[in-house]
Amino acid sequence: IQLAGYYCYYEDPNPDAEYWYTQLLADAVPLAARLGVVMGIENVDGDDVTSLTKAMEFVDAVDSPYLQLYPDLGNIAEQGLDPGVELAAGRGHMVAMHAKDVRPGEPRRVEMGAGVVDWDRSFELLAAQGWSGRLMIEMWNDDVPDSLSRCAVARTFIEGRAASAGIAIVAP
């Protein structure tokens, strides 16, 4: 299950929000374990859990195989972070991944390949780690009439980049 790394989304966070976020993660682990569900913290845009380095603080604090990472490659780029540093921080803990393109200050609605994500480097780093897992393409097409064709183009783009780096693509 993907857990967004926002302490609060629609309102200003409480000064103790990080503490409560940690407590809620720890409280969720026994249920996740009982149900056999792995939770993954997504690094997000904004000011909360914006990096895999930060997300690993929660993973380490809770210390359960049922709490891991769900990286968003676009959010790494949008935050201006180094994918080499971030993906190394998450090594062995990345259970699934988001692929979306971004521009600085524009974390949504950027056409795949038109933003600043260094896809080749990111996928090469993941391949070097031997990473495999679910790779979801995050799209923000809202109500545009050609949403399906945009999704198909994005999928072809991402599959091509991942395959070029040596990441096996298995069709659903």
Regions found by a protein language model. Give the residues of each.
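Active-site acidic/histidine proton-transfer and metal-coordination neighborhood
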Residues: I1-L69, E78, S149, A171
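Conserved beta-strand positions in the central sheet of alpha/beta enzyme cores
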Residues: I1-Q2, G40, V95-H98, M136
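Helix C-cap/helix->beta junction micro-motif
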Residues: R34-L35, P65, Q129-W131, A165
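Gly/Pro-rich active-site loop or hairpin
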Residues: D48, L52-M56, D60, N75-S132, ...
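Short, flexible loop/turn segments with low-complexity composition
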Residues: M139, A168-P172
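C-terminal helical cap(s) of enzyme catalytic domains, especially alpha/beta-barrels
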Residues: S147-A168
